[in-house]
Design a protein with these regions (language model features):
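Conserved class I S-adenosyl-L-methionine
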Residues: 97-124
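Core SAM-dependent methyltransferase catalytic element
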Residues: 130, 135-152
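A short glycine-rich, Lys/Arg-flanked "PGG" loop and its adjoining helix->strand segment in the class I
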Residues: 15-19, 82-97
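A short acidic, Gly/Pro-enriched loop at the edge of an enzyme's catalytic core
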Residues: 57-69
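Glycine-rich phosphate-binding loops of nucleotide-dependent enzymes
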Residues: 4, 66, 77, 95, ...
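A short SAM/SAH-binding and catalytic strip from SAM-dependent methyltransferases
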Residues: 67-81
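Class I SAM-dependent methyltransferase SAM/SAH-binding core
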Residues: 1-59
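Short strand-turn motif at the edge of the Rossmann-like AdoMet-binding core
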Residues: 29, 74, 101-104
């Protein structure tokens, strides 16, 4: 599930990766973005992409329906992060994961304002406080951290 899918930049790449037997949920709170994703679904005949117009505090996905949540540069927009994590935990299938990619908390000429950035260490602490442990970390991105969490 691509949380904060926007225009579907990652959604359609993930859909290609999971193939015809997989499914990618494009989750966004913006009706305009969902319309854009729906248009791309039709244009590309992406039968494995399902768009979801979500609530700000609920991705509106069925329990145990998601293998992996993909959250790139949008976590700071989620107002009630504790509630959101609780819901995602229920929505994960056994063995599921949450991928968090976000900007390092330092001054950059792009990305969200400094006060909205979440430090890597704070993200790990927040996830641990909500029942998720760090299972993998990738360091190939120069300006962002790439963390993978699994329920404890």
């Amino acid at each position: 599930a691509d949380i904060g899918a926007g225009s579907g930049y990652f959604t359609f790449r993930l859909a290609h990766f999971v193939g015809a037997k997989g499914k990618v949920y494009a989750v966004d709170v913006s009706p305009d973005m969902i319309r854009h994703v729906n248009r791309r679904i039709r244009e590309t005949k992406a039968s494995n992409v399902v768009s979801i117009l979500a609530d700000a505090d609920d991705p509106l996905l069925p329990d145990q329906s998601v293998n992996r949540f993909f959250i790139c540069d949008v976590w700071h927009h989620v107002e009630n992060q504790t509630k959101y994590l609780s819901l995602m935990k229920k929505m994960l299938k056994p063995g599921g994961e949450i991928v968090m990619i976000d900007f390092h908390k330092k001054e950059l000429p792009f990305g969200p304002p400094m006060q909205m950035k979440i430090a890597r260490e704070d993200m790990i602490k927040q996830m641990a406080a909500n029942g998720f442990g760090l299972s993998k970390e990738h360091t190939f991105l120069p300006h962002q951290y790439f963390l993978v969490f699994a329920p404890k």
